[in-house]
Regions:
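SAM-dependent methyltransferase catalytic region
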Residues: 1-104, 110, 114, 123, ...
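C-terminal substrate-recognition regions of SAM-dependent nucleic acid methyltransferases
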Residues: 28, 32, 111-281, 288-350
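Flexible loop/turn segments at secondary-structure boundaries
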Residues: 45-46, 83-84, 261-264, 363
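Hydrophobic alpha-helical membrane-insertion segments
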Residues: 49, 265, 356-358
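Short, amphipathic C-terminal "tail helix"
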Residues: 351, 355-365
Length: 365
């Protein structure tokens, strides 16, 4: 549950947030019947790790309790992370996307359009839930304070368990999905591929720094890191590796686990190839390769706008976990890839090509 002290304030500044989400019958506590619920609920509580990945979202608890009260209308403004990710939001997302009473979503890619001067990675949205509505949702998308698109559509499509926020991307997604190819995510490791993410204790989120050196010794292997306020290459004993020992002597590609902020116009995944006898910190994910040539061809694919476009459909924060690659199809990596080649393979129209080109790195020379 949520810590009561976070939401009970001094007299005169009393907060009803705790009562609303914890009382079995909050209507009795408030001495009122709820016909319309409108709100901007608390977004998260900190668990010792600040405002980043360790901040536990709680806004979903207010939405769930509001729906349970069965008013006629609910409208709340919340972070948009729940569309495709967010810590502990999987069940909430599943319920929301299956709820046919979701009549409208107004999605702001940049949260500062609603809250000037405030950064909320992934943007914010407000929704209209209507007890008497049953149908597809009308999705409004805003960029730079302007309405960019509006579409009445399902919240979920076959083969996905997330909300694809960009209306104009739906037909492109369907066209690519029709090829029924394996997902690129199957090639990408899970978090912390070599087991270096060790914390002081279950309640203390401070990291235990791996014992690595900057000079090579006889029994050491290469150690790629991107944390502790710097990045580079160190050396570490193979004995310090806690899992996936079989990956140490493979040729592999490393990709960062955190990239940008969820902004398709600037976020860029930059892969790099590392030779065998190597490992990395938990700030990277690993793509195993059978040869140097295959690794080069995979990198050529990752560097395309096409690839980044499909990642963008699931990546709305800085997190670039294995899951964000789920909608990206695998290719034949006996050959290299370019955007032109990919657009032709999937039969994209010129309008669809222009959409991708303008969404992903539009200012690229």
């Amino acid at each position: 549950g949520v810590n009561k002290k976070l939401y009970q304030r001094n007299k005169g500044l009393e907060s009803y947030a705790y009562s609303f989400i914890h009382e079995d019958k909050p209507e009795e506590a408030f001495n009122m019947k709820f016909d319309v619920i409108i709100g901007n609920p608390p977004y998260q509580m900190n668990d010792g790790g600040g405002m980043g990945a360790s901040a536990m979202p709680i806004y979903q608890k207010f939405v769930e309790k509001a729906i349970k009260l069965s008013p006629t209308y609910i409208s709340m403004i919340v972070p948009s992370r729940w569309f495709a990710g967010g810590r502990g939001l999987k069940d909430f997302r599943k319920k929301m996307l299956a709820d046919k009473r979701m009549q409208e979503i107004h999605d702001f890619i940049d949260a500062s359009d609603c809250f000037p001067g405030v950064e909320i990675k992934g943007g914010v949205n407000f929704f209209l839930w209507n007890k008497n509505f049953d149908g597809d949702c009308t999705v409004h998308t805003y960029e730079s304070s302007q309405l960019k698109s509006k579409m009445k559509r399902p919240l979920m499509f076959e083969g996905t368990d997330v909300f694809i926020r960009y209306n104009d991307s739906i037909e492109i997604f369907k066209k690519i999905k029709s090829f029924e190819e394996k997902s690129f995510s199957q090639l990408v490791s899970g978090n912390d591929p070599f087991g270096f993410d060790i914390r002081v204790s279950p309640t203390d989120y401070r990291r235990v720094k791996p014992k690595y050196a900057l000079k090579k010794s006889n029994e050491s292997i290469l150690f790629y890191y991107n944390n502790w306020s710097k990045e580079g290459i160190g050396y570490i004993s193979e004995k310090e590796v806690n899992k996936n020992h079989h990956l140490i002597n493979e040729i592999k590609i490393l990709v960062p686990k955190a990239v940008g902020s969820g902004d398709a116009s600037t976020d860029e995944i930059k892969p790099f190839i590392v030779e065998s006898s190597s490992c990395c910190s938990e700030t990277y994910l690993v793509i195993k390769c059978s040869s140097k040539k295959e690794a080069e061809n995979i990198c050529s694919y990752i560097k395309t706008k096409f690839f980044h476009f499909l990642v963008t459909l699931l990546k709305n924060t800085q997190g670039a976990y294995q899951k964000v690659y789920e909608l990206v199809p695998q290719q034949n990596f006996d050959e290299s890839w370019t955007d032109k080649k990919l657009y032709k393979k999937y039969g994209l129209s010129q309008n669809q090509i222009d959409y991708i080109e303008n969404l992903v790195w539009p200012n690229e020379d």
